[in-house]
């Protein structure tokens, strides 16, 4: 899980999801998981 000021899609499988006011990236590639912090 990467914590970043700006989350970006890293590949075509990445999806940007908003959960409880937190922006996250979910992907089939575990290294692409990100959270805005």
From Swiss-Prot:
GO terms for cellular component: cytoplasm; ribonucleoprotein complex; ribosome. HAMAP family: Ribosomal_bL36 (MF_00251). The keyword Ribosomal protein applies. It comes from the Bacteria. The keyword Ribonucleoprotein applies. GO terms for biological process: translation. GO terms for molecular function: structural constituent of ribosome. This is Large ribosomal subunit protein bL36. Coiled coil: none annotated. InterPro entries: Ribosomal_bL36 (IPR000473), Ribosomal_bL36_sp (IPR035977). It comes from Acidithiobacillus ferrooxidans (strain ATCC 23270 / DSM 14882 / CIP 104768 / NCIMB 8455). Belongs to the bacterial ribosomal protein bL36 family. Pfam families: Ribosomal_L36. Keywords: Ribonucleoprotein, Ribosomal protein.
């Amino acid at each position: 899980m990467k914590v970043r000021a700006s989350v970006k899609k890293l590949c075509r499988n990445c999806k940007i999801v908003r959960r409880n006011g937190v922006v996250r990236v979910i992907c089939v590639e575990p290294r692409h998981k990100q959270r805005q912090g």
